[in-house]
Amino acid sequence: MDTSNDRQRKPTLLNRRQMMLASGAAMAGTIPLLPITRATAASETGAAELRLTAGARTLTVNGKWARVFGLIGPNGKPGITLAPGERFHVGLVNRASTSTIIHWHGQLPPWTQDGFPWPQTPPLAAGDTRSYDYAPIAGTYWMHSHQGMQEQSLMAAPLIVHSAEDIRADRQEVVLMLQDFSFRAPEELLAGLTKSSGTQSAMPNTGMGNGMTTGSGSMAAMNMGSGMAMDLNDIDYDAFLANDRTLGDPEVIRTERGGRVRLRLVNGASATQFWVDLGALNGTLVAVDGHPVRPVRGSRFPLAMAQRLDVLIDLPPGNGAYPILAQVEGKRARTGIVLAAFGAAVSRPAAEADANAPPIDYSLERRLEAVTPLAPRAPDVKHRVNLAGAMAPYAWSLNGEYWPNISPLMVATGQRVAIEMLNHTMMPHPMHLHGHAFQVIAINAVPLAGAVRDTVLVAPMSSVTITFDADNPGRWAFHCHNLYHMMTGMMTEVRYTAMI
């Protein structure tokens, strides 16, 4: 699929630093440097305001046209990339025909700039502009709508914040964003799940509709033994996208022979988890959810919904082409891109693997160690959150409560907080806390000094414990990042006592 005329341009040979800077928030690779379009407003620091435009766009997916949303940055490409030390000073312009609100996933802004539709921070009306200005944290992040089901209609994009170390490393940067896609409207997909099971969405009717009309819902199951079945996929999607394209027309990213690449992987899918396979290559995982981890070597990595991975790859010196493939857990379907030396012939990878991918498990999570863990400290407050729900009736809850009728998890500024999440269901739940980076400290009650991150997968019939410092007062959403689970109730709030 082709969303621009970029593929008609002859590749421009740049050095690695130029390649990294040119990549911007583009979905990948070696694009020419483009003029930066900035709004006229300036922050208190004097920095010009970057413009981010939310609006509609057209894709071709498997030969068919589709009208979707997009978040287009100042270089005309999806998303935003910031230089080391640059503030997140952004003017969000809503050119869509409906209201929206954009969440800066994994970033730690003041709560009124987080991009969640609290009464105090309502969605941005069509035609309006809203400014954001805060000091970002470096790493691989992303942005997506928190308005209804707009995320499923591709209202999402990368958010990359470079560090000084990134610049010194002088690696070619490749951003790979994964998404799931259906020609049906998200509301139709949700209705297929809830109405067939006799339930209705728990989300209130507050004008938070998707505003975009573009499979029917079904469940894929895998036998776990002992008569139990793991539910992996709620939706039968029409396609899985890598940088807006399928393997019918994959993006080919040209690299230097023997080049050094930093692959930034973003799972922006609404209800799909992937196994990322580097094929003939080996890589070194150096960060998860934007936060550095001690190096983990490998060629195959799990990637839950909303999570990110940074993988360093040293390419062979020859004139080769190397597919980077993401296979859907529990399915043969896959998507991906191709890294290829300039002049190398490229073969189109098969859209299906030879066998179904296994479920995402804890094999990687147990190995992860934060480079900068939280300082040792006993928790001042502990919360237990029970994850419950079922496919029939289709409804998902936290502590037996369905959003918005919830009891907040209360914390106070300065506390060390621990949250134990117990998954009583046969589905995995990627749990995301807004406004904080937490550390994983136990899996199935077995202690570990795990990764610092913002989204952790809680596998079926298991538990995960996280801890964080309550250092960002406000109201913060805490939810499953499977959009269909969240829309049917699987969300609560972490609220500071100062907000009462």
Report residues per predicted region.
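A contiguous, surface-exposed recognition patch within enzymatic or periplasmic domains that forms
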Residues: M177-F274, R377-D380, W396
